[in-house]
């Protein structure tokens, strides 16, 4: 069980602290053989850069695309100007792509957990991990973004309450 949630997205469970990062997919299948080899080497380097004194979990979550979230966060709103025809076309392309994928989205996360004496030590540790992940996943043009508490709790909410994604509320 989670004992304490800190404002910077670090969670405490027993004597361990954890932090989660989201990373984006890379276009591996579309790359040349040489580029694929380079991507694989860089990905291995990113994983090998993770601390050996910590537990690391990679999570791949396939989830249904929520229509309301899709409209709110992905599609462009019309503004009543001369560019609305382009916005409609852009939205049509995105909507068609979403339909082709059976409305499934794949989210990828890395969660690192480590035993530390106190929060200050844990925070120092995670600052170093954050810098390493940002640098190494940046080489892949994938990026790694540390999740805040709202993002982490939303993952749990959406996973355990499919179809109720729009009911998520968080206030710390």
Regions found by a protein language model. Give the residues of each.
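Extended, folded cores of ATP/NTP-driven motor/assembly subunits in large transport
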Residues: 1-172
């Amino acid at each position: 069980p989670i004992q304490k949630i800190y404002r910077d997205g670090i969670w405490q469970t027993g004597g361990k602290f954890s932090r989660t990062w989201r990373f984006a997919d890379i276009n591996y299948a579309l790359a040349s053989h040489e580029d694929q080899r380079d991507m694989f080497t860089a990905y291995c380097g990113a994983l090998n850069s993770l601390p050996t004194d910590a537990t690391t979990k990679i999570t791949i979550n396939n989830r249904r695309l929520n229509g309301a979230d899709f409209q709110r966060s992905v599609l462009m709103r019309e503004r009543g100007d001369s560019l609305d025809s382009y916005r409609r076309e852009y939205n049509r392309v995105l909507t068609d792509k979403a339909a082709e994928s059976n409305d499934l989205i794949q989210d990828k996360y890395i969660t690192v957990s480590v035993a530390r004496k106190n929060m200050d030590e844990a925070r120092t540790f995670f600052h170093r991990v954050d810098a390493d992940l940002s640098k190494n996943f940046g080489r892949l043009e994938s990026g790694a973004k540390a999740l805040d508490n709202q993002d982490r709790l939303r993952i749990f909410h959406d996973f355990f309450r499919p179809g109720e994604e729009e009911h998520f509320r968080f206030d710390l």
